[in-house]
């Protein structure tokens, strides 16, 4: 039962899907952390895989860059394939001195300059938030592993190359823990279709200081984020 953008059959996906932006990162996650992996889709080279993590069936699929792209994949996964939970795992930029490069952050909510949630919410502001139990499970998973995480609001930007850098000062004032491009869209889609969602990000660069991670450092901290995400799935099952 293929959709316009996913050529998988019903039952190919687990009820929980981890979603990085990069489809090659999805492949890395599947090959590194999952067992008994099967590739289930590849339309537009947006790869999806299903395997097991400590015996638990889990899927992983790329979502591309930006709210329009991730919203398409999240909608089809939830509406057409019966996915119940989505965990976005990606990178973000920091704007606060309290947030350091290589930190792992959990987005309990997502502000945005996109109008996408106003469009779906009849012109009104929609509070795009993560599922509380998923946030709690991720915090507990991180604590059990000794991985420090920061929890707060993300900012999902429409533009990567912004013409308004002064907005970063406003974000800092309001305590934004990371700037990325998808969480608000995924949270909106999950709310619209009765699913649950969470975003966990690794800070890859600091917008204010210009500090950036090397590719090796990104990989190491990304692995911490992935362990938190996968362990949180198991904790969520135990509730």
Swiss-Prot record:
Residues annotated as site: Important for catalytic activity: 218
EC number: 2.4.2.1
Residues given in the record as a purine D-ribonucleoside binding sites: 5, 180-182, 204-205
GO MF entries: purine-nucleoside phosphorylase activity
Top EC category: transferase
Chemical reaction(s) catalysed: a purine D-ribonucleoside + phosphate = a purine nucleobase + alpha-D-ribose 1-phosphate; a purine 2'-deoxy-D-ribonucleoside + phosphate = a purine nucleobase + 2-deoxy-alpha-D-ribose 1-phosphate
Record keywords, A-Z: Glycosyltransferase, Transferase
PANTHER family listed in its UniProt record: PURINE NUCLEOSIDE PHOSPHORYLASE DEOD-TYPE, URIDINE PHOSPHORYLASE
Job of this protein: Catalyzes the reversible phosphorolytic breakdown of the N-glycosidic bond in the beta-(deoxy)ribonucleoside molecules, with the formation of the corresponding free purine bases and pentose-1-phosphate.
HAMAP family to which the protein is assigned, alphabetical: Pur_nucleosid_phosp
Name of the protein this chain belongs to: Purine nucleoside phosphorylase DeoD-type 1
Gene designation per UniProt: deoD1
């Amino acid at each position: 039962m293929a959709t316009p953008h996913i050529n998988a059959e019903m039952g190919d996906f687990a009820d929980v899907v981890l979603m990085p932006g990069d489809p090659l990162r999805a492949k890395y996650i599947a090959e590194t952390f999952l067992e008994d992996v099967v590739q289930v889709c590849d339309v537009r080279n947006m790869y999806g895989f299903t395997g097991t993590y400590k015996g638990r069936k889990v899927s992983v699929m790329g979502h591309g860059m930006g709210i329009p792209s991730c919203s398409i994949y999240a909608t089809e996964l939830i509406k057409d394939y019966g996915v119940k939970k989505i965990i976005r795992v990606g990178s973000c930029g920091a704007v606060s001195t309290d947030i350091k490069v290589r930190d792992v952050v959990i987005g309990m909510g997502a502000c945005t300059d996109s109008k996408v949630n106003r469009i779906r919410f009849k012109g009104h502001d929609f509070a795009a938030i993560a599922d509380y139990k998923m946030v709690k499970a991720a915090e507990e998973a991180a604590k059990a592993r000794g991985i420090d995480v920061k929890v707060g609001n993300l900012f999902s930007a429409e533009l990567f190359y912004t013409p308004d850098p002064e907005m970063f000062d406003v974000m800092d004032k309001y305590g934004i823990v990371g700037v990325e491009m998808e969480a608000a869209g995924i949270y909106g889609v999950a709310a619209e279709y009765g699913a649950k969602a969470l975003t966990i990000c690794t800070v890859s660069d600091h917008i204010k200081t210009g500090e950036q991670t090397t590719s090796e450092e990104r990989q190491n901290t990304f692995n911490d984020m992935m362990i938190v995400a996968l362990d949180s799935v198991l904790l969520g099952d135990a509730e």
